[in-house]
Amino acid sequence: MMSKLGALLIICLLLFPLTAVPLDGDQHADRPAERLQDDISSKHHPMFDAVRGCCHPSTCHMRKGCSRCCS
């Protein structure tokens, strides 16, 4: 019984390999250059104080990448 299941699995994988499944066009893995252009780093973010390394007090609770709010 197990040999029949193994043979069936091999036949299915040969007829329909997993690499033949097309990736979705919206996935970022297909377009790494666009992913890098869309990245907004913290030093370009208007609510981030690059000198002190902290966020504007009104947005401190919204951002996880900044340290405690500057006072």
Curated annotation (Swiss-Prot):
InterPro entries: Conotoxin (IPR004214). The lineage of its organism: Eukaryota, Metazoa, Spiralia, Lophotrochozoa, Mollusca. GO terms for cellular component: extracellular region. Belongs to the conotoxin M superfamily. The cysteine framework is III (CC-C-C-CC). Classified in the M-2 branch, since 2 residues stand between the fourth and the fifth cysteine residues. It is found in: Secreted. Keywords: Disulfide bond, Neurotoxin, Secreted, Signal, Toxin. Residues 1-20 form the signal peptide. Disulfide bonds join 54-70, 55-66, 60-69. This is Conotoxin TxMMSK-05.
